[in-house]
Amino acid sequence: MAFVQEPLPYDFNALEQYGMKGETFEYHYGKHHKAYVDNLNKLTDGTELADKSLEEVIQIAFKDASKAGIFNNAAQVWNHTFFWNSLKPAGGGAPTGEFAAKINQDFGSFDKLKEEFSNAAATQFGSGWAWLIDDGGTLKVTKTPNAENPLAHGQKALLTLDVWEHAYYIDFRNARPAFIKNYLDNLVNWDFAAANYAKA
């Protein structure tokens, strides 16, 4: 059973007016994400991992140093699909309802969450990801290097931001802080995060 690249939840140009060009998706989704899927299929073809779910492959390979290449590609396939869903046209704003109340409880305020998330994304050295997670019933912000993700650590991801340079270089060049601000102001999909929280 081959691993597949999930379709984008919007078209390539849907986020143009919100700070993310169609060209970004042509490269990021059309080339980078696709390459991870293709590499994962090559690395797992004919192995016992070929029939596992993507999540199972991530968890198995993370614990086995000999499967580092499989882990990196599997995690990046999962991370990118999760990232596309963490974005939406006319995103931003603020969460509502039970999820908003939980944010206030665990962070003190929504502004404090945004501050912690922005800091995590800005201070991740080199390539990686910033995450909002549910860690045993407590909401936390974390960051991971390269392909690593909360799933590998037994945590529930609610939302992510890709801070690899290829995620923002077409739109923001080397200005990662501007990319982070635009994500929180115009792109972040709090409905997706709330739905993940409800399932946690």
Swiss-Prot record:
One Pfam family here: Sod_Fe_N
Chain residues that bind Fe cation: H28, H80, D162, H166
Domain of life: Bacteria
Cofactor dependence: Fe cation
Record field: catalytic activity: 2 superoxide + 2 H(+) = H2O2 + O2
Note on how the cofactor is bound: Binds 1 Fe cation per subunit.
EC number(s) per entry: 1.15.1.1
Database matches in InterPro entries: Mn/Fe_SOD, Mn/Fe_SOD_BS, Mn/Fe_SOD_C, Mn/Fe_SOD_N, Mn/Fe_SOD_N_sf, SOD_C_sf
PROSITE patterns noted in UniProt: SOD_MN
Gene Ontology molecular functions: metal ion binding; superoxide dismutase activity
Keyword annotations of the record: Iron, Metal-binding, Oxidoreductase
Top-tier EC class: oxidoreductase
Keyword Lipoprotein: no
Family: Belongs to the iron/manganese superoxide dismutase family.
Function statement: Destroys superoxide anion radicals which are normally produced within the cells and which are toxic to biological systems.
Quaternary structure annotation from Swiss-Prot or TrEMBL: Homodimer.
Entry protein name: Superoxide dismutase [Fe]
Organism: Nostoc sp. (strain PCC 7120 / SAG 25.82 / UTEX 2576)
